[in-house]
């Protein structure tokens, strides 16, 4: 199962999920259109989501599971791959809880301007092209931005700007995989899963000095 919890941030409530001792989800809990991300994880990992704590004491609604909503990014297919097998449930459950705690703590440090780099182990689930885009996103430095055209060129597909943008939308690990650092070629903010206000806040935060 994928253990999940909700975590409040200045940008809104984030839905965190862990599987196999790695973080597989950090997405915007209040955006219904993001349900396709949850569905992709369930199908790619062949598991379902389960809340943590088990008593449901965390506020808000969790993942809705598989729905009939079509995947807008074309990754809703049996060829979706993942860097994980089926871990032992007991040991994995403890590891997943530790990962969720660590992710929440590092997010708090990030929003408090006390952290610039995350070291939580990540698990991505997507097509080879999507995962190549996400890997490239992790190379964009804190405080910097890149364009969709730059990403496409770096991947060797300069005309695949729309495909790169779609892969950004499909990113299940917001902030940890910093798709908010991607802007239009003219510097415009363009879109963002958490909304433009959240993107503006994140980019503004990353231009503040690091507090010790």
Describe the function of each predicted region.
Residues 118-122, 164, 189-192:
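Short clusters of hydrophobic/aromatic residues that line enzyme substrate/ligand-binding pockets
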Residues 181-183:
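Short, basic, alpha-helical segments at the C-terminal edge of helix-turn-helix-like DNA-binding modules
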Residues 158-161, 202:
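LysM (lysin motif) carbohydrate-binding repeats in extracellular/periplasmic proteins that recognize
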Residues 1-158, 209-212:
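Basic nucleic-acid-binding alpha-helical/helix-turn surface characteristic of O6-alkylguanine DNA
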Residues 174, 185-212:
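…primarily DNA-binding HTH/wHTH and HhH modules…
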Residues 161-171:
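Regulatory, non-catalytic segments
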Residues 14, 128, 145, 158, ...:
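Gly/Ser/Thr-rich beta-alpha loop segments that engage phosphate groups in nucleotides
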């Amino acid at each position: 199962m994928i253990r999940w919890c909700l975590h409040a941030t200045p940008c809104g409530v984030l839905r965190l999920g862990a599987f196999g001792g790695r973080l597989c989800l950090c997405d915007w809990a209040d955006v219904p259109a993001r349900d396709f991300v949850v569905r992709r994880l369930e199908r790619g990992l062949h598991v379902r989501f389960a809340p943590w704590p088990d008593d449901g004491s965390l506020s808000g609604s969790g993942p809705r599971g598989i729905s009939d909503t079509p995947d807008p990014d074309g990754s809703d297919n049996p060829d979706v791959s993942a860097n994980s097998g089926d871990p032992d449930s007991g040991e994995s459950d403890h590891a997943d809880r530790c990962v969720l705690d660590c992710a929440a703590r590092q997010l708090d440090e990030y929003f408090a301007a006390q952290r610039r780099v995350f070291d939580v182990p990540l698990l991505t689930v997507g097509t080879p092209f999507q995962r190549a885009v996400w890997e490239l996103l992790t190379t964009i430095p804190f405080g910097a931005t890149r364009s969709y055209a730059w990403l496409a060129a770096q991947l060797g597909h300069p005309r695949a700007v729309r495909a790169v943008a779609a892969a950004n939308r499909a990113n299940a690990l917001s902030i940890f995989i910093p798709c908010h650092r991607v802007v239009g070629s003219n510097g415009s903010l363009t879109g963002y899963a958490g909304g433009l206000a959240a993107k503006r806040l994140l980019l503004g935060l990353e231009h503040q000095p690091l507090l010790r």
